[in-house]
Amino acid sequence: MGKSYWIWYPGDFELYHGMKQNFSRVERGFGWPAFWKSEGFRNRVAFRRTYQLEKETSFTVYSNAIGHVLVGDKKYSFGKKIVCGPGEVAVGVHTGCIEAFPCIYVEGEVICSDKGWIVEDYDKEPLPAGKSKYFTEPNQNPTVWEYSEKVYEPVSVTEYNGGTLFETELNAVLEAEFKNGYQPVLICCGESREEAIDPVHCYYSWQPDKETGKCPCCAVRFAYIPDCKPGEVILRANHQYVDIPVKASFHCGEDRLNQIWSVAEHTFRLCSGIFFIDGVKRDKWIWSGDAYQSFFVNRYLMADADIDQRTILALRGNDPMTKHINTIVDYSLLWLLGVDYHNEGYGDRDFLELVYPKMVSLMGFCNGRRDEHGFLIGKEKDWVYIDWADMDKDGPLCAEQMLYAACFRAMEEISEQIGKDGSVYRAEYEKLTAVIEKFFWDEEKGAYIDSFTSGRRNVTRHANIFAILFSIADEKQQEKILKNVLENDEIPAITTPYFNFFELDVLCRMGKLTEVLDKIRSYWGGMLDLGAVTFWEEYDPSVPKEEQYDMYGDHFGKSLCHAWAASPIYFLAKYFAGLDLVNKDGVTYILKPQMQYFTELDCTLPVGSNGVVRLVWDGEILEITPNADGGILELGEQKLSLVRGETRRVNI
């Protein structure tokens, strides 16, 4: 038999499962579907392929839809063996489904649903069919994701205030077993002990299903059953997850950093399922800005291109584009920059050609929302986010224009890469950066201001960080920004792990590795000191411990397991272990290890889809063992080639 996959209209699988993900939020007993435009999948599609058959062959088509198989001018039912050939045979599969996206599975020696099928929706030009490595058997249903499962017993069971407190794992389906028959008990769940023992304010409280004893899946580290003695009810946690292998490992001579890496990895894996989601507790939604940072961590931890691509397709939706992604202006821009970063890491030409028209239409949508100066502005019902921070958002926001400019440059490069003319994007980039300098650069302050329309000339870190990160500021301006903004304690500090990611990335690029490592130890280590087992959505060290879980006006509103807080993996891997992917001129990756920050190190990192590289440092000798092609080791001015399977040893 040929290798078959379930196939569908490209993007529909992601839109369908993305819809289910974004409709999964439940809070204190009520459902809360995501508050942005929900993109629909196609209900009527046709699959086509023409074969040149040397001899007679047979095949069978399975589908979740109604429809038929057309071979020549004869129609056949799904599930029936079809015999055809020899000669030219045109196969068409016509499907319609109201409940979900139509998909088919073609089983046969020669005619099978592998790469080569095209699909059309009777509206746009045919496209190569979509598929997934997770759906390769005829008895599967691509509309139902088959999760891996692992059952965890509680790590502790204690009596508290007349009830029973269980400590368990995160993001699980709780299963209750009753010693004396079913009881309609209330199970209060929490990411923290404080939340679980507060039945009034906890986010999740359930009565187990009478037949199965199960509760809905939720973020649960602690579970509390009031008015229940230990032993009367037995709880287990059934963790459902997508089994994406971790390719990286990290161990150094400092326990603090090892623990930070481990907790960041645990945090990130919990937020990595069918898609990258923000966190496992509150939203469980697919946010573009959160996903953008997840692409960076993914490259250095799992290097799984598929989850990147599923997330990208679920976020963008269909053309024409009528609303910003997640309603947020900057999240539309970060979607495009995320495609650029993904392409840099994995270089999947087929995926790039699939998504390129969506990139073009997104830029066209944004270009239609400019003011008289050419600045991108928020229209009615658009959310200009950037960060949870006080900044002057009167009129065009400088930080937004930095992202907008970066998108023009990314579009130029990607257009040229796939044989399109990128000059129009270069011209737009040059025009926009010129007016950014004219209206937002303040020479007296030595920094970019938030807004020029309010007259306040307010300076925050955000626009200035983006100016360096995307190379919009020149070298002299960057030095001024470093002094006047990044190293200036009078400029309000960043308090979210989300924007700490951007700030620390800039500091690393400017050679401030000591400061970055100290920040990783203190900021992420500060969460560990407060008992964190996963990293949080937000952390302000100045806030009293009893108020740390407060957010959005809710006593337990803060997510304590948030993907954007896993960024230490990226910093330690890229800037300290020193791995950078380049994919240019025959060089796949460059390794610039900074061993002066470690007493010892044993680290394995993925090199895109190309393999892995291992670094072992004992304080004197550095051993590099690559299982990837095209590597260069840079030690100061010295450049040494790295050959797959050969260990290189150097004294440092």
Regions found by a protein language model. Give the residues of each.
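Non-catalytic C-terminal accessory modules of carbohydrate-active enzymes
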Residues: 127, 145, 514-652
